[in-house]
Design a protein with these regions (language model features):
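Short, well-ordered beta-strand core segments
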Residues: 30-32, 52, 130, 167, ...
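General beta-strand structural signal in soluble alpha/beta enzymes
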Residues: 34-35, 54, 84-88, 111-116, ...
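Class I S-adenosyl-L-methionine
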Residues: 1-15, 20-117, 216, 221, ...
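Conserved beta-strand elements of the Class I
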Residues: 6, 30-33, 84, 141, ...
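A short alpha->loop->secondary-structure connector
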Residues: 105-108, 131-133, 185-191, 318-321, ...
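Conserved anion/nucleotide-ligand pocket segment
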Residues: 150-195
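Class I SAM-dependent methyltransferase SAM-binding "motif I" and its flanking Rossmann-like core
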Residues: 90-93, 97-163, 349-350, 354
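Signature of uroporphyrinogen-III synthase
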Residues: 13, 65-69, 73-78, 177, ...
């Protein structure tokens, strides 16, 4: 039985612009065929057991020719698999989606199309440029500025000028100058407003507000693909309506190690504020056997992972939280409190280790911290409950990072491993907790603490640091 191909528009760059239907298609895919402009955050939605095929299409460089991509889709569908063809922007707006479906239709393969947000409208919107405005234009026109190799553009420039609407040129970095010259030759005033938006909707987005006559000078400043060329009176609204460039962390590159499940929330908080977030692979917790306590025993948890280790031990023995009814639950630090609350439990006591009542106390800690806690709480029974496994990370260019955000000691360890051999002296860090900040300083970093032990407080501290520069 033949499978199915779903063409999914991934949107223009911001992973948050993927549609709900597109997300569902990715999460259910057995094969995903994707292009260069697809964000890594979207690729993370692909099931671990799905086959990934990178066809790497780039402007002027197609490592996998279009006809071969068409054959890949056909072949995988004929194997009976659910195939997602993930394309930047919208599949049917200069995305060659129609060409890919023609072969599938000819071979009676079932297919579906999930439209995406096109860069033609999203990139101007992120630059504060509405594609239409009744006081300025009555139409918008999306035009390709791409030409086949060794061929000239065949556009009716006089007709475009007569339209007196907003003109949006896609795939035209190499032809911006030519297009501007031809528009002026067709009667457009040299001082007519236009804009260039590079990397639209991405944190590294740049824009140039200029005129048709000044476009060539902007291009000489090194405009790179992907970029769009917008010609129209609506470009004059950008200074008033540009919300994207006003975000407090715009253009900042912030490294976020991911040692615990809620670290992605920090990445989201920073992205919403305009930062380019670089995430390190998350160290994983390996839970160790925990001897379950009897009634009347005090259980002291030293981190959120201690709560996870305890609940895992209960589950492995066929028990649940009711088995803790006779125990006194204590939390050393707010992180442990949050970990316990995740399971609907509240501690009987929370505070610092030096105030813990140690009689009949079993203290759950990370394996490599057992000796430290044994010294701090000599009368407690110290039980190593988990160890941290570090994953191999890609090399990090510290010179390109503005800040590192550390949420736990484990995140500092992950960073140290990823930067092994490089001394991060002077690299700025914002940390949750005094111990985390101390560990960062031990690496030679310029580490500061957030006012509170929350992700929101950490984001606010980063904002304040950037505002004070």
């Amino acid at each position: 039985m033949a499978g199915k191909v779903i063409l999914v528009g991934a949107g223009p760059g911001d992973p948050g612009l993927l549609t709900l239907k597109g997300r569902r298609a990715l999460e259910q895919a057995e094969v995903v065929v994707y292009d260069r402009l697809v964000d890594e955050e979207l690729l993370a939605l692909i099931p671990a057991d799905a086959e990934r095929i990178d066809v790497g299409k780039n402007v002027g460089n197609h490592p996998v020719p279009q006809h071969e991509i068409n054959q890949i889709l056909l072949r995988k569908a004929q194997e009976g698999r659910r195939v997602v063809r993930l394309k930047g922007g919208d599949c049917f707006v200069f995305g060659r989606g129609g060409e890919e479906l023609e072969l599938l239709a000819a071979n009676e393969i079932d297919f579906e199309v999930v439209p995406g947000v096109t860069s033609a409208l999203a990139a101007p919107a992120y630059a504060g440029i509405p594609a239409t405005h009744r006081n300025f234009c009555a139409s918008v026109h999306i035009i390709t500025g791409h030409r086949r190799r060794d061929e000239a553009l065949t556009l009716d420039y006089e007709a475009l000028v007569r339209l007196d609407g907003t003109l949006i040129f896609l795939m035209s970095v190499a032809t911006f100058g030519e297009i501007a010259q031809e528009l002026m030759a067709a009667g457009m005033a040299s001082d007519f407003p236009c804009a260039i938006v590079e990397n639209g909707t991405r944190p590294e987005q740049r824009k140039w507000l200029t005129t048709v006559g000044g476009a060539a000078a902007c291009i000489a400043q090194g405009v790179r693909s992907p970029a769009i060329f917008v010609v129209g009176r609506v470009c004059g609204l950008s200074e008033t309506m540009d919300w994207f460039d006003r975000r407090p962390l715009k253009g900042r590159r912030i490294l976020v190690p991911r040692p615990r499940p809620d670290s992605h929330l920090l990445a989201e908080l920073l992205s919403e504020r305009g930062a380019r977030v670089i995430e390190l692979p998350a160290p994983s917790a390996e839970y160790l056997p925990v001897e379950l306590p009897g009634a009347g025993v005090t259980l002291a948890l030293t981190a959120a992972e201690a709560a996870d280790a305890l609940m895992t031990a209960l589950e492995n023995t066929g028990l649940d939280a009711r088995a803790l009814a006779g125990c006194r639950l204590c939390c050393v630090g707010k992180d442990a409190v949050h970990g316990l609350q995740k399971y609907g439990l509240r501690p009987d006591w929370s505070g610092e280790i030096d105030a813990l009542e140690e009689e009949d106390c079993t203290l759950l800690c990370r394996e490599d911290e057992a000796a430290r806690f044994a010294a701090l709480a000599p009368r407690a029974k110290v039980c190593p409950a988990w160890r941290v496994r570090m994953e191999q990370a890609a090399p990090i260019d510290l010179d390109s990072v503005d800040f590192v955000a550390f949420t736990t000691l484990s995140s500092v360890q992950a960073f140290a491993q990823a930067t092994e051999g490089k001394r991060p002296t002077g690299v700025r860090a914002v940390c949750i907790g005094a111990r985390t900040a101390a560990a960062a300083r031990a690496l030679g970093m310029d580490a500061l603490q957030s006012a509170e032990m929350t992700l929101e407080s950490m984001a606010a501290r980063l904002e304040a640091l950037c505002a004070g520069e």
